[in-house]
């Protein structure tokens, strides 16, 4: 196997995820020679704006994909929730490895549970999806935008006027944070996760058969089927970071999938949600999207995409 160059965002979490995946690869191919190339994306450079107000898709992947096309890197290790549902021609997801916990983590001052927060409490999140779902259930709370890496957000919780923050549990786990800092993990029935949350997507060139053969050895087919249902729903709904959209699939021992798709208005006042089961992940994602479109969810998405 030739020497491989892995493209990664420069954030601590992205680099940690990349190193952990390389370790996983080396368990099946111990003699691999791999280096990481750090790449700064548009999403990384935007630190003073809410990403939902920037517009566009692929804010954290486009520059990395260009490096693949230019043969500067051989593969890219993405948080799958950052990857648009349609990839450019010539690129493919070479594998979907094991998935970390897909839930959202609620972290509050003095470990006060979400249900016990006083009216007017300020909850920090960078996600329209989280904000809309919290407001729907707890309209007397205030949602306040927060950006930065995990360390920065935890610091802001301590030093600024936030009473709580919500983060992806997967990032906390991968960065080695103890469960002790988490007040509670939020059940998907309360907070439907983001599409692909907790999963990684390993992107490479479609014609790189040598690398694709290697990646197949660390591919998790069950996770791939779950995220395929989720990403099909995202594609069919034309979702983006301007839209409060969620989707979460599970698979049972018989290979049967259960998928919940969610579309909301940013203020939490309109909610479209549907759960369905099936054996074909693509058909399942389409089925749920068709139902939500019939209910009127498409109007929310079209309006939000026009605003961006």
Curated annotation (Swiss-Prot):
**Mind listing the GO biological process terms from this record?**
protoporphyrinogen IX biosynthetic process
**Could you tell me what this protein does?**
Tetrapolymerization of the monopyrrole PBG into the hydroxymethylbilane pre-uroporphyrinogen in several discrete steps.
Upper lineage is:
Bacteria, Bacillati, Bacillota, Bacilli, Bacillales
Q: Name one GO cellular component term.
A: cytoplasm
Q: Which Pfam families match?
A: Porphobil_deam (PF01379), Porphobil_deamC (PF03900)
User: Which GO molecular-function terms appear in the entry?
Assistant: hydroxymethylbilane synthase activity
Q: In which pathway does it act?
A: Porphyrin-containing compound metabolism; protoporphyrin-IX biosynthesis; coproporphyrinogen-III from 5-aminolevulinate: step 2/4
Q: Which cofactor does it need?
A: dipyrromethane
The identity of this protein, by name, is: Porphobilinogen deaminase
Q: Which reaction does it catalyse?
A: 4 porphobilinogen + H2O = hydroxymethylbilane + 4 NH4(+)
Quaternary structure and interacting proteins, as annotated: Monomer.
Q: Which UniProt keywords apply?
A: Porphyrin biosynthesis, Transferase
Q: Which residues in this protein are found as S-(dipyrrolylmethanemethyl)cysteine? A: 241
Output the PANTHER family linked to this UniProt entry: PORPHOBILINOGEN DEAMINASE (PTHR11557:SF0)
């Amino acid at each position: 196997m030739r020497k491989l160059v892995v493209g990664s965002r420069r954030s601590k979490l992205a680099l940690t995820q990349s190193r952990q995946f390389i370790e996983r690869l080396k368990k099946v191919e111990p003699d691999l020679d791999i280096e990481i190339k750090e790449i700064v994306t548009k999403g990384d450079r935007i630190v003073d704006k809410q990403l939902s107000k920037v517009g566009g898709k692929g804010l954290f992947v486009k520059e990395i994909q260009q490096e693949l096309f230019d043969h500067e890197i051989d593969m890219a290790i993405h948080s799958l929730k950052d990857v648009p549902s349609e990839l450019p021609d010539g690129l493919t997801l070479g594998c979907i490895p094991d998935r970390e916990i897909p839930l959202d983590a609620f972290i509050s001052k003095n470990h006060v549970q979400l249900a016990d927060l006083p009216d007017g409490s300020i909850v920090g999140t960078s996600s329209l999806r989280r904000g809309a779902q919290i407001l729907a259930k707890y309209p007397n709370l205030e949602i306040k935008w927060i950006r930065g890496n995990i360390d920065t957000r935890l610091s802001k919780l301590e030093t600024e006027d936030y009473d709580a923050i919500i983060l992806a549990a997967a990032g906390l786990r991968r960065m080695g944070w103890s469960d002790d800092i988490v007040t509670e993990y939020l059940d998907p029935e309360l907070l439907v996760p983001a599409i692909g949350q907790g999963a990684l997507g390993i992107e490479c060139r479609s014609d790189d058969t040598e690398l694709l053969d290697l990646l197949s050895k660390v591919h998790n087919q069950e996770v791939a089927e779950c995220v395929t249902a989720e990403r099909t729903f995202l594609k069919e709904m034309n979702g983006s970071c301007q839209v409060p959209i969620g989707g979460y699939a599970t698979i049972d021992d018989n290979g049967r999938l259960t998928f919940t798709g969610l579309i909301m208005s940013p203020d939490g006042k309109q909610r479209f949600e549907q759960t369905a089961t099936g054996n074909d992940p693509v058909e399942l994602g389409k089925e749920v999207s068709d139902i939500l479109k019939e209910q009127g969810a498409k109007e929310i998405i079209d309006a939000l995409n026009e605003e961006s």
